[in-house]
Amino acid sequence: MRAPQAASSRFTSAPYVLVAPLALVLVVFFGIPLVLVVVVSFFDLDKFDIIPTFVLTNYSELLSSPLTYTLYAKTIKYALIVWAITLVIGFTVSYFLVFHVRSILWQMGLFLLCTVPFWTSNVIRMISWIPLLGRHGLLNQSLIALGLADHPLEFLLFSDFSVVIAYVHLFSLFMIVPIFNSMARIERAVIEAAVDGGASRFRVITDIVIPLSRTGIALGSIFVIALVMGDFFVVKVMSGGQSASVVAAMSNEIAILQYPPAAANAVCLLTIVTLMVAVIMRVVDVRRELSG
Amino acid sequence: MVTRSSNGRPWTFYALAAFFTLFVLFLYGPMSAIFILSFQGPNGGLTFPMNGVSLHWFGALFAQQRSGDFVGSFSRSIALAILVLAMTVVISIMAGLAFRYRFACATAVFYMAIASLIMPGLLLGLGVGLMFQFAGIRPAWFSSALGAQLTWTLPFGLLIMFAVFSRFNRVYEEAARDLGARQWQTLWHVVLPILLPGIIGVALFGFTLSYDEFPRTVIPIGSRNTLPLEIWAMTTDVTSPALYALGTLTTAVSFVVIAAALTSIALIQRRRARRQRGHPDARRGGAEALPRTAGVRVGADAGDA
Amino acid sequence: MAQAGEIELRHITKRFDQTLAVDDISLTIPHGSYCCLLGPSGCGKTTILRMIAGHEAPTSGDIRLGGESVVGLPPARRGTAMMFQNYALFPHLNVLDNVAFNLKMRGVRRAERHERAREMLAQVQLDRRFSERMPAQLSGGQQQRVALSRALITKPRVLLLDEPLSALDEFLRLQMRGELRRMQRELGITFVHVTHTQLEAIAVADLVVVMDQGRIEQAASAHEIYTLPASAYVARFMGGQNVLTGTVVTIDGGVATLVDGSGARFATPVKSPAPAVGQEIACCVRRDRVDIEKLRGPSPSPGEATNVAAGTVHAIEYQGSYVKVTIDVLESEQVVAHLADHAFLATPLDIGDAVLARWATEDVYLLTGDLTHPPTGVRPGPLQGRESRSRNL
């Protein structure tokens, strides 16, 4: 974001006019709703009616319930597992595309192949696992036919396993895209210089590729963690109602119009997600590297 | 990779290629399963084996009593997606232009966009729903749902515009000014055409992110569903391959849109492509311009900036 | 009244934040002349060009074109046209539309503007069959012709060229620089050409402006710059000269004798006002006026002779028509001699040979510029690059 050379010296209203629509939409549909959620989290609840007042009961009930901690632990566990898996996938796939695919055309083609599902419906992609993993699904049928199992494996669907599978399926693209992008910017000459300097293939990865793709890794991590922490539908469908997450519990409260407790829950979740993102941003100055 | 001297590929290539192939199978396998199952015979079930092949379940979609308001939700989704696309393109371009200047609240707007992107969708929907409730306005797809979706598409649009502008060489603007173009002429005849592949990328994001949006839309949608919400409802009620037929149809629409966008980007790129056997110096002429990468890397740009 | 294409810079200063890019420059470029701004990168030459074009505003000072101040006017209303480095051809427009761009902005009808663009392309000798091509499909030389016709279609009184030849290979560079010169003669307008290549400037320009660190070192004809450099900096930067520095010990009959740090004595003709005895001065002698004598003995000593430097051969480079011999001189700057190839072959030298370099007093030229310039470390400047560059030539 360099300032235009001719315009930088004198004041101009142009950027304010140009950024106004974006700022307006964000303030109205993100800023105000966010404030409202915080405000409502202090409201009281009488059956299904919201009472505008200031109480801390929503928070005290939330924080005193052991179920809350179980839910948060479960959600964070999902987030960390999915983060680790998608990080490995994202790094490996990008590394393959950037450093092993020689033709630029093939590289772009294969990259697009990875990104196309990103532009299709998440709900559809999630439910597409059901006919595969179910009790009578394709995987169980094949295992039995091959004699690898004598009865259908129950853990495949409606379990933590299927939840994680679906998360990885939906969100690994968010890791691949930024990592690929920052890796693609690494100059080949840098790698060759490292090899000439006697670096092994492994040391090239740890000493050159990882540090130089840290922006992508950080961005991908932010996306994946925020997406898993904010999910409710994958965990609802893929666990078959046996597991839950923070937002899934919240959506149940919303469904029965329990807005203030849901809002208190939302504020807690937002705080945790913000902290996680802040930690990542602290490790890698994403903004500076983006605008450079 | 690293050892490029010989023609043979190192073993790591084959290991990584195998990994990549498995990953692609993992990505597309389940989708192809429901694609196949959507052609299930009339008596077929939700899983394999196929019990005949038919278009029965596609027909069932259009019989409203069976699977809800498919036609209505589909047309609403398309209308909403086009609205979101238009607004995302215009607002993102304007914001992208704005961020080329230094201005007072640039950092604040940037972080607000990022926060809006990572905010759990349902929470944002809850907030928008509360806002409309307090304001006494009935939520509807063209008001509350539209706003909620823009908080998702605009940050993406902004990030793509960052990437696009970071590759844009300002010398074209100077050249245009030198040749007598006014500011808006420069924008219209030079900047926007050169950035067109990136702008198509923004449009693609705007459309598909809206068309498939679910968590942000579910609360502020009001009484009439969009297609993803309809599918979501079906996952709990409908236990027939009609669900898969719907999935196949909506994915087909997505693919048509993606293909149209990518094809137009590719056509623009090819029109501007440098000749392979061109003079080596030709490469330097416009090399800093963006055409080479902007469009093809559209996907990459998402996370990039 | 100044003629239309006369450019006058009056006390132009340009700052970027804390950096002083152009430092109080005054210069008049006559109408219809070919002027080269020459200097190492970062010397401010491109900034001056951009200020004339209107892409940059001076921090202070006035720019006059044809006698009228243009500061604050948009580029298109100055009667200037710029040919950008790497040409900046619009990648989304074909050749014809690139050339016709200015006419399109002015609302000229399609048929007419294409017709005029074709005429313009013919004038720069670009084949008709290229007119539908995209810029990326052209070679560097063709791109340059398109850029030239795109600039000339605006009928400018001043054409500004920013490193116009740097994107071309050696062969095309020589060809195109001749064509630029020919175009300038034909059109009779002012050309201002920015370059960092000495030979390019000398080959085309009526007026060469040598710049360093935001200031003009010398503005004169190519011949004068080359043979009568104004300062040690110009002498070194242009190459072709050996710069001698020392303290004046005697002045006698229009000849000053100086002694350098190693005790060697040099003589130089002086004009009035003559330097005072005891003053530190610099003079130069052309490399092709230096003779070399091979010594038998191992330890060369110039003794009391003037205009002799003793040293050992450091490098010998064959340059085609002459041989460049570099000599290490004890406690002093290297001396470079350009020897005619037949003279060299008559008495061949080897690296490490002890030699005496000698020259005639009448070939020495007194440098008047600031001896201590450049002030090392005061302002950022590519000192390193400059020194190595001047040594190479």
Question: Which functions belong to the PLM regions below?
Answer:
Chain C
Residues 59-62, 112, 213, 245:
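Conserved coupling/switch loops of ABC nucleotide-binding domains, chiefly the family-specific signature
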Residues 75-81, 85, 89-236:
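ABC ATPase nucleotide-binding domains
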